[in-house]
Regions:
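His/Glu-based metal-binding/catalytic segments typifying zinc-dependent metallopeptidases
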Residues: 1-17, 41, 164-177
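Short, contiguous acidic/charged loop-to-helix segments that flank catalytic cores in large enzymes
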Residues: 2, 42-47, 118-121
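M16/insulysin-pitrilysin zinc metalloprotease superfamily fold
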Residues: 6, 10, 14, 30-93, ...
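A short linear hydrophobic-aromatic micro-motif
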Residues: 22-28
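A broad, low-specificity signal marking well-ordered, structured residues that form hydrophobic/aromatic
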Residues: 23, 38, 145-147
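Hydrophobic side chains in beta-strands
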Residues: 27, 42, 149-151
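C-terminal regions of mature proteins
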Residues: 74-177
Length: 177
């Protein structure tokens, strides 16, 4: 949670404000099947998907140093923000249902997960997170899924090959458990 929050604004600032790559620029995180994912997205009318991918990759390489360079005050603000988010009670029956469903099916009915996460957040140090991020994004260990979509007006300058031609056929070939 802290890593995702720490990278949101710098990614937006660099990709949208500084490089002016596109109007839609965002990043987020997701936990699924005990895996933690970071998402980075850019939609552009001016730049092709392979160029956006290259620019995002260059930014992602700088993430550990961004975290290391963060001030202690900023890190504490991110820590408190993450804790506050976890302490928020669901505001509707729908939100509560989604939260319970996630706890049951994604986290083996670990109903005290938020409390454990809050405890871990309180005890983690900035340098620990930076080192973890460095390991995760290292050349030998990083795992990425890149979804590149080319608009009709954009050419595939890198000559990237598509892994499928028809989305419907591709979806039929997926096995979901």
């Amino acid at each position: 949670m802290i890593i995702s929050q720490a990278l949101k604004q710098p990614f937006f600032t660099e990709m949208r404000t500084n490089q002016q790559l596109g109007y839609i620029v965002w990043s987020s995180n997701l936990n699924r099947d005990e895996n933690h994912y970071l998402y980075f997205a850019i939609q552009s009318g001016e730049y092709s998907a392979d160029e956006l991918n290259h620019r995002a990759d260059e930014f992602i390489k700088t993430c550990p140093s961004l975290l290391k360079a963060m001030s202690a005050d900023m890190f504490e603000q991110l820590r408190e923000s993450a804790i506050e988010k976890l302490e928020q009670k669901p505001k509707s029956i729908s939100e509560r249902s989604i939260k319970l469903t996630t706890l049951i099916f994604e986290h083996n009915a670990e109903f005290d997960r938020d409390e454990k996460t809050i405890s871990a957040i309180r005890n983690v140090e900035k340098n620990e997170l930076a080192e973890t991020l460095e390991k995760i994004l290292g050349e030998d260990s990083h795992r990425m899924v890149n979804c590149l979509m080319f608009a009709d007006g954009h050419s595939n300058t890198a000559g990237l090959a598509s892994t499928f031609e028809d989305v419907r056929d591709w979806k039929k070939s997926r096995i979901y458990k």
